[in-house]
């Protein structure tokens, strides 16, 4: 029998578990997969299968991440879980697993701990838009007042980092009980409550094709008699022949018109997100466009040089630097398709950054780049990746 085609009838959402070590992230991940697979089909996963997360590479950085899938009544979810704290930091900063929402797991017995705080801060910095809380190990707390206290603490912590703490869904339960097949309030019922919260609280993400048109420039050719062709992969949106576009970054922004879209040597009337295309530009000279710029819908994205970012610096073992760096360190910042030199300003309380650290920095680039909050970049020295980062806030 032929393999069934994957029918994506339900909208797709990416989520992941975050929170302090040993608060039950992996147990909860296993419990969700197990309970939901019995209700809506899919694969149950054992704790050990998730905990033995395979290595993968993102932007030259090795990260251990477990990917599982499950379905609810309304949606299909891809869920990431990481074994170690360092893996979370790397994952969130590189955007290896872009999350539409996160499930913050917090032990009711311990309350918020240092990594609870750190993961909420990271989620804020890297632009995770929604957090839902699973208050775990509630079977170990008999005192209702204590539970209330922990819930208040978590809400305060979320509000402190600009998440809507008062309106955040908090589900009380026990991942362990649910995984063991307990049908009670803290077991299976709690997992179903969590599934409902995921469905109702995290909005369906915009598909790439519905975004405003953006294509990073990879190469530029001039074709005699036809003009200038720019090639690249469309990141989001749709480009139609005859539409006005802007060329943004590196130099002053220019306006032009798309007079043709080519794919696999065929002429099309439009290109869309995910397509590798050549775009023919009217009246644009070859030397007006270069790798590192973007083509975009006019007015949709601006060039910037000054921003704050959250970065992870590779350890020596990962092929990174062997020595720390200090204020005013000047590496290259690799955005989309090109390197731009920039200088790094460290936070007041930070004298230096060691390989393996993550830190908030302020960057000034020597040339402007088409930039939005949430844009990922690599930090390089002579073509070698020494770090990864994400734009947290644009200054100018």
From Swiss-Prot:
Location of region: G1: 19-26
G4: region residues: 136-139
Residues covered by region (G5): 174-176
UniProt region (G3), positions on chain: 81-84
Primary location: cytoplasm
Binding sites annotated in the UniProt record for Mg(2+): 26
Keywords, comma-separated and alphabetical: Cytoplasm, Elongation factor, GTP-binding, Hydrolase, Magnesium, Metal-binding, Nucleotide-binding, Protein biosynthesis
Localization (cell): Cytoplasm
EC number(s) reported in the record: 3.6.5.3
One GO molecular-function entry: guanosine tetraphosphate binding
Swiss-Prot/TrEMBL catalytic activity: GTP + H2O = GDP + phosphate + H(+)
Domain tr-type G: 10-206
Record-stated family: Belongs to the TRAFAC class translation factor GTPase superfamily. Classic translation factor GTPase family. EF-Tu/EF-1A subfamily.
Function: GTP hydrolase that promotes the GTP-dependent binding of aminoacyl-tRNA to the A-site of ribosomes during protein biosynthesis.
Protein name: Elongation factor Tu
Species whose genome carries this gene: Ralstonia nicotianae (strain ATCC BAA-1114 / GMI1000)
């Amino acid at each position: 029998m032929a393999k069934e085609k994957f029918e994506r009838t339900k909208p797709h959402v990416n989520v992941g578990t975050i929170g302090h070590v040993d608060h039950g992230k992996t147990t909860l991940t296993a419990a969700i997969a197990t309970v939901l697979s019995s209700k809506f089909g899919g694969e149950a996963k054992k704790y050990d299968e998730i905990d033995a997360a395979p290595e993968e590479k993102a932007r030259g950085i090795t990260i251990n991440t477990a990917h599982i899938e499950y379905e609810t009544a309304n949606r299909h979810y891809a869920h990431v879980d990481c074994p170690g704290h360092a893996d979370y930091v790397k994952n969130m900063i590189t955007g290896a697993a872009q999350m539409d929402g996160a499930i913050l797991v917090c032990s009711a017995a311990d309350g918020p701990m240092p990594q609870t705080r750190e993961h909420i801060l990271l989620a804020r910095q890297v632009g995770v838009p929604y957090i839902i809380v699973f208050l775990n190990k509630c079977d170990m707390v008999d005192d209702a007042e204590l539970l209330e206290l922990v819930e208040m603490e978590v809400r305060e912590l979320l509000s402190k980092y600009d998440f809507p703490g008062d309106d955040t869904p908090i589900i009380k339960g026990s991942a362990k009980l649910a995984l063991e097949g307990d049908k009670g309030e803290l077991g299976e019922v709690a997992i179903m409550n969590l599934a409902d919260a995921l469905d109702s609280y995290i909005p369906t993400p915009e598909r790439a094709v519905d975004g405003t048109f953006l294509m990073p420039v990879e190469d530029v050719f001039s074709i005699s008699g036809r003009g200038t062709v720019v090639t690249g992969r469309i990141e989001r949106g749709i480009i139609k022949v005859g539409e006005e576009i802007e060329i943004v970054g590196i130099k002053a922004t220019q306006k032009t018109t798309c007079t043709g879209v080519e794919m696999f040597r065929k002429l099309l009337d439009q290109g869309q997100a995910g397509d590798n295309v050549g775009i023919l530009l009217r009246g644009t000279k070859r030397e007006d466009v270069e790798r590192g710029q973007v083509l975009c819908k006019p007015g949709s994205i601006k060039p910037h040089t000054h921003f704050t970012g959250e970065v992870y610096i590779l350890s020596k073992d990962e092929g990174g630097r062997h020595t720390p760096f200090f204020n005013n360190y000047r590496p290259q910042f690799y955005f989309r398709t090109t390197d731009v030199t920039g200088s790094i300003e460290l936070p007041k309380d930070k004298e230096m950054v060691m390989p393996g650290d993550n830190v908030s920095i302020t960057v000034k680039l020597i040339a402007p780049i088409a930039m939005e909050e949430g844009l990922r970049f690599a930090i390089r020295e002579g073509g070698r990746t020494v770090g990864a980062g994400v734009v947290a806030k644009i200054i100018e």
